[in-house]
Design a protein with these regions (language model features):
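Extended, Lys/Arg-enriched charged tracts that mediate electrostatic binding to polyanionic substrates
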Residues: 21, 26-56
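Charged, amphipathic alpha-helical linker segments immediately N-terminal to NTP-binding catalytic cores
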Residues: 65-103
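Glycine-rich, often acidic-flanked micro-motifs
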Residues: 114-132, 142-145, 155-192
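Short Lys/Arg-enriched alpha/beta "domain-start" segment
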Residues: 16-19
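Single conserved hydrophobic/aromatic residue that forms the stacking wall/gate
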Residues: 2-13, 193
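Conserved Walker
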Residues: 139
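Conserved glycine(s) of the Walker
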Residues: 136
Length: 194
């Protein structure tokens, strides 16, 4: 259930090895991370970060000074992320983006952004939509007259705006075929919702 993927574009990306306890987590993160080509894996060597997704591991709050048995722990020195005590696959994605928020500006001169983005197919003008989770970024970016760049996490560099992810992160609860037809139809193609 190990998944090797990357986040970013061209030479501006970080590779992660994600070891998952559950197959559903591996399926989720495989869709969210860009999948590197064999030649890219050979060229870049070891992953930049290792993510351990262990929903079955419960932290002892008394020993660790936590307020819950679930935890997301990031060790920048060892380049390891532990997602423990939670089966919510979104924590894997969000923990990797937290690392990208720190590393991209420092190591690659890229501004990471929690936003959606689309592009006019004729003028190539880009629209960027910022907002908290659940505020409509995905809906705004899924405009049938524009090209979707991505719906949640982007980078802004000298090359322009690019999607950090390899997939989209649409919320499925309450989707309406009339108001959000592109998103509604896209999730109907999937066999599993995580």
């Amino acid at each position: 259930r190990d998944v090797l993927g990357s986040r970013g574009l061209g030479d501006v990306y970080k590779r992660q090895l994600v070891a998952c306890e559950r197959a559903s987590q591996a399926l989720f993160i495989k869709q969210m991370l860009a999948r590197p080509l064999a030649r890219e894996i050979a060229r870049t060597g070891e992953p930049d970060f290792c993510v351990l997704a262990a929903p079955g591991y419960q932290c002892d709050p008394a020993i660790k000074g936590l307020n819950s048995s679930a935890a997301v722990v990031i060790n920048f020195q060892e380049r390891v992320i532990l997602v423990a005590g939670t089966g919510y696959s979104g924590e894997i994605k969000k923990s990797i983006f937290s690392v990208m928020n720190y590393l991209l500006p420092v190591e690659d001169d890229v501004l990471p952004m929690h936003c959606s983005a689309s592009m006019d197919p004729v003028t190539h003008e880009t629209a960027v939509f910022f907002g908290l989770s659940g505020t409509g970024k995905t809906t705004l970016s899924a405009n049938p007259t524009r090209l979707l760049i991505g719906d949640d996490e982007h980078g802004w560099s000298d090359m322009g705006i690019f999607n950090i992810e390899g997939g989209c992160y649409a919320k499925c609860e309450g989707l309406d075929a009339f108001h959000e037809p592109e998103i509604f139809n896209a999730v109907r193609l999937s066999l599993i919702h995580i």
